[in-house]
Amino acid sequence: MKSTSGILLFILLSAGAIAFSRAPLYTCEKIKLFKAHGVVVWSTPNRSLGIFYKSSLAIDADGAFRAYHPVDRLGLDSLAHAGHRGNWWALVTDNEEKSGRPILQGDSDPAPGYYVSTTALYNADNSNVRDPRRYVDAAAIPYIVLHPKVLNYARLGDFATVVNLQNGKTSAAIAADESAPNLPVGEASIALAEALGVDSSPRTGGKNGDIAYLVYPGSGNGKPRRVQEIVANSRDLFETWGGVSKLNSCLMASSADANR
């Protein structure tokens, strides 16, 4: 779904083409943290500085106001990705358990008739669990989904930088959701995919390979943030970490080591 603020969001998030091949190389000191589903996750020696990996990008619609609908074709994503009867892992239910019946948005909500879709990161100051605005909107906020093993080193609310290595586009991001252990490493929101120039359809979009993720552990406050805050914090953290040159070197070095 393209929001009316899509053009502005693209301008805010896209820092332009990054010429990785032309960047001067740094010596990259790194530590292998783990490997999951074929993706090796690395850290710089002081892991508070950065965790990075190269992977694919699957599209997550969770938190978007029109993510899921009782009539499956009307939702941004297939209802099967929100769960099934007795196990609704991505929807608010009447008993606030996965076993309950999904709650529909009302007339005063952003998308009446659509289900209330959740994210692992949410606004705790809003005590109304049935309010769709409590969660991180995938259509508006550039967020990444962390694999459970990554959450051993980083936490929800931390900032990140994500790069499309094929076209050089980069985007700031926040960690706002958690994947299941059996799912591949590498998932992001609709808004983040748009900023990277990737097909953002949760049903048919995404990208196989050539996406670099850099997460800054301990950088967030465990709360959702506005786009402007995400951009400003991630930009400063990326520059402090070493920027394009260091990421280029670390990706090349990690690729060589992973193939040994």
Task: Enumerate the language-model features and the residues they cover.
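Short beta-strand-centered aromatic/proline hotspots
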Residues: S171-A180
